[in-house]
Amino acid sequence: MSSSCNVGASAGGGGSVVMETSNFAHVIFQNVGKSFLPQAALECHYTLTPFITPHPKDWVGIFKVGWSSARDYYTFLWSPMPENYTEGSTVHRTIIFQGYYVPRSDGEFYQFCYVTHTGEIRGASTPFQFRPATPTGEELLTVEDDGNSDILVRVEEVQQECKELQKALRLLTQERDQLQEKQRQQNQELQKSLIEEKEEAQSRVRQLEQDLLKITQKAVLKETELDCLRDKLQKVISERDSLQTQLKNERDERELYKSHVRSAELENTKLSAELQMLKAVELNREVTIAQYQEELHRLRTERDTHPAETGLKEQLRQAEEQLQATRQQAAMLGSELRDASGGRDRTMTELYRVRQEAEELRAHLAEAQEECRHAQDQLDRMKNQTSQEMGRAGGGVGVASELEAELQKEVEELKLRLNMAAEHYKEKYRECQRLRRQVTKLTQQQETQQGDANRNDASTETTLELHTPDAETPSESYPAEIKTVARDVEKSRDEEGNEQEEEDEEEEECSLSVEAELACMEEKWREQCTINENLKLLLANEEKRFKTQVAEKDREVSALRESLVVVTKEKERLEKQYMREGTTRSRRLEVREPVVLRYPLPYPQDPPPLPLVPQQPAELQFGNPYLEQETRDGADGALSPEQTCRPPPLAPPPWGGPVVCSQPSRSLSPPDGLENPTEERPTGGDGEAPAVCEHQSLESNESHTSFCFDTRPDVHKQCPLCEVIFPPHFEQSSFERHVESHWRVCPVCSEQFPLDCQQQLYEKHVHTHFDGNVLNFDNFD
């Protein structure tokens, strides 16, 4: 039913009014008479029905019958705002028009109209006139004129007025009949539509109540699941905190191990330098001992020929004292060497223990990540179920809103960024695999982490809006019963008018009861919708909060994963560096030091006498007594000067297990039954020591080039590659480091590569030493 109102009036024929069905019944004017006194105070009584909401700017005006808009008022008064007004209630109000505002007696018809602040006319009264009171018989005057004729005053005026009123009455009666017929038809249609709307609303309310009950039950179940997930999340957070604490402890231990490694490196460097120096001293002392022994033998042979026996005895005693001191120094050097080997073994044991603790930490982190992934999967399943159930409860919900589209776009962007991060992680992971193939367990855990990184932890939220049906409350217009103007017509139509009024009152009461019931149902529906909206908001807030917590947890786990990767890489680098240094130290320690003989030297019985010269050549004239001990066990043999300059072995022996254990120094002397090919040693003149040999095995020549360095302190050292000359007293270790800097050395087999060698070839060679097992060096080149 339309809520607009139109009032039309025809100016001709005494101002007859044609009114259509409108909203004029929203304000009902009461006790409106047929006429009022002009220039006198006028009371206006009206009732505000529940279909109108009063406003302080509403007003009541006096309009001439035939007005066309709200601006055609004669005068008006503001409608007072009722006190303690309740929406939907009926209010009775009264206003008084002062006498100087009331129109004069002009024979026109007027009516009250209620105008809202928006300019809509929501109520109109029956027409009335402003005229003086009807004169009685006593008020009639008889006037005698010159023709002695009596003239009745006001008779003609009254007769004319009576004719106009009768004509207006006929028009109003016809209009009333038409309006009554039209009203009956509209009432029937309205009643039918109200019944249909009521039944539809009731069925809709029942359906919504059932849906609300189902949603409430499901919300309780989801709340229970959320509580379980919160408990699991709390456990994961506690485990994460413990892992963080453990990681912090590991970092502290790593720093401590770093400091220990640095101190051990410094100590090893110092011990290596001392060992080289002691080896050089020992070699010099060995040569000196041989010289003294030869001199002693010569002196014994000349003792019979020289009378100065006392001087010879003194020289012999001094030589024996020097020999004893040399033996003591050799014993001290052996003790220091054993201490250095024990320190190396302790350092390797600590490094292995650090590796085991790192593996345990990685296992704990993998378990925590698996629990996080399981909790995230449960949360995703719960969100999908909630979105599907909310979609079914929403009924005919339209397409997703713009907010959904924006959220979907953000989710796609997050997925793209996650994929890019996963690709970057894959590259880093492949690089780590190339550098460390021997750690199988760590590889499997990293592959599991790679699979977890591709998982999408972003879910799409669906916003459902329940649209409440707009129950269009129909409005009714009940035109007031037109009363008769003349007393004679009023008496004849009195009974019919009373019956019509009773019928109108009954219909109005029925309509009001139906409207009140509909209003009550509408109010209940609004309350239910409010409750549903509140439940949806609570559920959405809870899901958002849980999502935020899960995202924070994921970020923290990612940070822990990144820090663990950094720690792992740092530890691998330290392990490789320490392994290279340990391998280098082990190769240096494998060169056995000369052993002092326990038994006297087997001198020849009849050597030719030789004169004593001030500077005896370094080479023994009777041969090296140690070369005759080749048939002895390799453990008791000593190194010849040729053997001392041999390069270290290409690779350490294979280890039986991953445990770093202390290995005894290996003897480089040949086994029993084999002959060690000797090479001629050129002798130098004028007291020069024999030149250093350049022994290289055939295998060494095929694989790489090794250098033998002259350790004599009185010879200028020259780099064989860059031809840089160093002073005689330049440190031997610094000179060796300078020569080795021209090459890239394999950290496992010490094979040398030129600096311009391709990186891929160098890495391929290094990788060939590993087969994926920890500390397995069986596949050395």
Swiss-Prot record:
It comes from Danio rerio. Zn(2+) 2 binds at residues 746, 749, 765, 769. A zinc finger (UBZ1-type) spans 716-742, 743-769. May have anti-apoptotic activity. The C-terminal UBZ-type zinc fingers function as ubiquitin-binding domains. GO terms for molecular function: zinc ion binding. Residues 646-656 have a biased composition (Pro residues). This is Tax1-binding protein 1 homolog A. Keywords: Apoptosis, Coiled coil, Metal-binding, Repeat, Zinc, Zinc-finger.
